[in-house]
A protein has these predicted regions:
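Short acidic loop-to-helix transition motifs that present clustered carboxylates
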Residues: 24-25, 46-50
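Conserved residues at beta->alpha junctions
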Residues: 21, 46, 96-97
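Active-site-adjacent C-terminal substructures of enzyme catalytic domains
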Residues: 29, 33, 42, 51-170
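Extended substrate/RNA-proximal surfaces in nucleic-acid metabolism proteins
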Residues: 1-42, 64
Length: 170
């Protein structure tokens, strides 16, 4: 961790880092980044509720791309999605393109988190705003179709929605 901070030096403003707290040393990383003034955001995570609570206790205060690249909500295991909806001490960011989150999930986020508990983002990919078709981006072919952008394996690869589109869909 110290080598990272030596390499990047001083970062102006309030930098943000996203990490999965369940990785080996993840909770120590949360503490290290918080001590250096970072906003620690939890994302791409399969963490259980106890690990997420431990990350919150160490200063993590946000969740990246809420509901995506994380273990889904289950009736026997709230996981990161249930945790994010219930914890007042953590905000979440949502991609309101209706592909990353359904209209019902967006309504659930709004109801559980309130207007101060979530941040609207677009996750716009370089092909945002372009017509349906295939585009070469980041060394791979991305396909824009029906308002979604997907990689060759069919996974979402960012969004074609711009922020004003997301505002309208919220």
């Amino acid at each position: 961790v110290d080598a990272f901070f030596e390499a990047v030096g001083e970062i102006p403003g309030r930098p943000v880092v996203t990490l999965a707290p369940e990785i080996p040393g993840g909770l120590d990383l949360v503490s290290a980044f918080v001590r250096r003034g970072f906003l620690v955001s939890l994302g791409h995570t399969e963490a259980d509720v106890a690990t997420l609570d431990a990350a919150l206790a160490r200063g993590a205060r946000h969740m990246t791309h809420f509901g995506n690249a994380m273990k889904p909500l289950h009736h026997r295991d709230a996981g990161p999605v249930g945790w994010g909806l219930l914890r007042d001490g953590a905000t979440v960011d949502v991609i309101a393109d209706l592909h990353h989150l359904s209209p019902e999930m967006l309504a659930l986020v709004r109801r559980c988190k309130g207007p101060e508990g979530f941040v609207l983002i677009s996750d716009a990919a370089p092909c945002a705003g372009l017509a349906d078709g295939d585009y070469s981006v980041w060394g791979e072919t991305l396909t824009v179709s029906a308002g979604a952008v997907r990689n060759a394996s069919g996974g979402l690869a960012g969004s074609v929605a711009l922020l004003d589109d997301c505002v309208e869909r919220l």
